[in-house]
Amino acid sequence: MHAHVILAAGQGTRMRSRLPKVLHPLLGKPMLLYALEAALALKPERLVVVVGHGGEKVVEALEGYPVEVAWQKEQLGTAHALLQAEGLLRDFPGPFLVTQGDTPLLSPRTLEALLRRVREGAGMALLTAELPDPTGYGRILREGEEVLGNVEEKDAPPEVRAIREVNAGAYAFDGFLFQALKEVRNENAAREYYLPDLVAIYRAHGRRVLAVRGVAEEALGVNTREELARVEGVLLRRLRAEWMGKGVRMILPETIYLEPSVELAPDVTLWPGAVLKGKTRIGEGCEVGPYAVLEDTVLEPGAKVLAHTVAQGAHLHPGASAGPFARLRPGAVLMEEVHVGNFVEVKNSLLHKGVKAGHLAYLGDAEVGEGTNIGAGVITANYDGKRKHKTEIGKKAFIGSNSVLVAPVRVGDRALVGAGSVITQDVPEGALAVARERQKNLEGYALRKLGEG
């Protein structure tokens, strides 16, 4: 049994953003949720998030999670922020885990190691890491496992700044925590109450303070846009490695972007520059071409999305293909063996088995029957300026190039629409519809006009 407190009240001025720092996205998900999910993995008895700057937005992001919220009205430092949780946890005996909302790389295993030290008798345990460049972090003074002190960088003399072992911002405490917090003073350059000052307070009360050396990567926090990009790179590298370990082929993996919510099956091939977002799900043997973008899109086994195609909220069934340079908008459903080619846009439309739309077409609010061919330049004119209307095309029909089908309209099974037609009435099954002016040839006119006759 333990309680976990996540500190998420900081303003994040160096981000230069109106968005609270902990809500900046990492791989499509707010930074804070990484810290929250690591905390939940250890099944805490109580989970408190301390919010402050932009707190209303932060609380909104926490909706649906089993958390309690404490407020820090004034930004007076990390110790002051943690003290705001006392009202919720006053009767909780401990131990307590404390982490930061802007440190998203911490693993449950590392947090468990901190907690274990307190359960084994330490009063306080803090996570440390050795960084090649420790700029911006508090430095650790220690003797063996025992921590002698923790000095904030802004208050550190040069010889202490030279130390590369830093405070990674994660702690475990025994039940003495809130009593100790009330002894923290703000006698420092920033006039703030620092959480690391608890090291000296715990030691003064005869309680052991231990360091747990962690992986340097996990200590990375986010205070600037550059650090945000660095942390996102770490998360991406981990995610790519995980999927390649499960049988996904990535060609030039360092160029591929994907989010944790994406699901991939074995033998999927991702070409350079592929972007996979949201609830995208890709089945076995599928291929995603160079610089294709898929968001909330499903590819059933064997489907292909070719280069530079953008798909949002689409569903491709086995053997279907789209691209290159196709656009599939929400509600686009391509059944088995459908092919949508270059510069074809499909929106809120069902294309039945074997439909071909090779190039330069727009299919919106349409249903196209099995085996039908859509010629180049075909448009379903679905919008009359006020409402959207449906176009229905039957099985094995042929829609000639550069035709416009003005909805609402139906073209029957095995019907033909002549090239260049504007269809405003239903076309019966098996009929030929031609809606254009009859061609006239004026003999000799061109030669006379050009003066060569």
From Swiss-Prot:
The keyword rRNA-binding does not apply. Residues 247-453 are annotated as: N-acetyltransferase. Its cofactor is Mg(2+). Binds 1 Mg(2+) ion per subunit. It comes from the Bacteria. Pathway: Nucleotide-sugar biosynthesis; UDP-N-acetyl-alpha-D-glucosamine biosynthesis; N-acetyl-alpha-D-glucosamine 1-phosphate from alpha-D-glucosamine 6-phosphate (route II): step 2/2; Nucleotide-sugar biosynthesis; UDP-N-acetyl-alpha-D-glucosamine biosynthesis; UDP-N-acetyl-alpha-D-glucosamine from N-acetyl-alpha-D-glucosamine 1-phosphate: step 1/1; Bacterial outer membrane biogenesis; LPS lipid A biosynthesis. It catalyses: alpha-D-glucosamine 1-phosphate + acetyl-CoA = N-acetyl-alpha-D-glucosamine 1-phosphate + CoA + H(+); N-acetyl-alpha-D-glucosamine 1-phosphate + UTP + H(+) = UDP-N-acetyl-alpha-D-glucosamine + diphosphate. One of its GO terms (biological process) is peptidoglycan biosynthetic process. One of its GO terms (cellular component) is membrane. UDP-N-acetyl-alpha-D-glucosamine binds at residues 7-10, 21, 72, 77-78, 138, 152, 167, 223, 329, 347, 362, 373. Residues 226-246 are annotated as: Linker. Residues 1-225 are annotated as: Pyrophosphorylase. It is found in: Cytoplasm. Mg(2+) binds at residues 102, 223. The active site is at residue 359. Its EC number is 2.7.7.23, 2.3.1.157. InterPro entries: Bifunctional_GlmU, GlmU-like, GlmU_C_LbH, Hexapep, Hexapep_transf_CS, MobA-like_NTP_Trfase, Nucleotide-diphossugar_trans, Trimer_LpxA-like_sf. Acetyl-CoA binds at residues 376, 382-383, 401, 419, 436. It holds the Pfam family NTP_transf_3. Its main location: cytoplasm. In the N-terminal section; belongs to the N-acetylglucosamine-1-phosphate uridyltransferase family. In the C-terminal section; belongs to the transferase hexapeptide repeat family. Catalyzes the last two sequential reactions in the de novo biosynthetic pathway for UDP-N-acetylglucosamine (UDP-GlcNAc). The C-terminal domain catalyzes the transfer of acetyl group from acetyl coenzyme A to glucosamine-1-phosphate (GlcN-1-P) to produce N-acetylglucosamine-1-phosphate (GlcNAc-1-P), which is converted into UDP-GlcNAc by the transfer of uridine 5-monophosphate (from uridine 5-triphosphate), a reaction catalyzed by the N-terminal domain. This is Bifunctional protein GlmU.
